[in-house]
Amino acid sequence: MHGTRASGASRRAFRRLRAYEKALDMPELPPRARKGESSIMGHTDNYTLLCDFYELTMGNGYFQTGMDQQICYFDVFFRDVPDGGGFAIAAGLEQIIDYIQDLRFSPDDVDFLRGKGVFSEAFLQYLLHFQFTGDIWAVPEGTPIFPGEPILTVRAPAIQAQFIETYVLLILNHQSLIATKSNRIVRAAQGRPVSEFGSRRAQGADAAVLGARASYIA
């Protein structure tokens, strides 16, 4: 890339893309993906609908069959460390705590889901009052972790434990990956200064900021 000014061809291509999306009547983003402000990344800090759709359909199934309050335990772990690294570094717990504390469905969220036509009305009303009431145990950030051992354990009613799965894995996998790589680099540097330039190749602004955070923890 040799500059930041968009060429005429790029602008025309962008306009064609917008026109194409409009012609297809593509659905809007979930409402809360467009609102709010985050203290760390400068945009939405409510990720309630950042989940795999099946988490919601399974929750609907739990609710309809009376299993929604069944207490269950989920363990987060990994199976191996690639390249003979021996151990990984845990990171991302702060973002998971923030997510759990802010986990709410707004009326706009529920209306968005109602429009999908696959959820019972009783379940949608339940979501309006959804609140995580379970317990979570986790190793501190920066802790060396090893294959097969629990990194984070969730004890909660089935519907709640199921719903947070996507975000917990997203955050732990990404930040622990970056922290582990950074730890290897720092150890290889043997006391020499190390700089973090992850933003240049990160997969988006969120990954850049949270990756830098994970590198610092390592």
Where are these regions (language model features)?
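Serine residues within intrinsically disordered or low-complexity segments
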Residues: 7-10, 30, 38-39
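N-terminal, Lys/Arg-enriched amphipathic/low-complexity engagement segments
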Residues: 72-128, 137
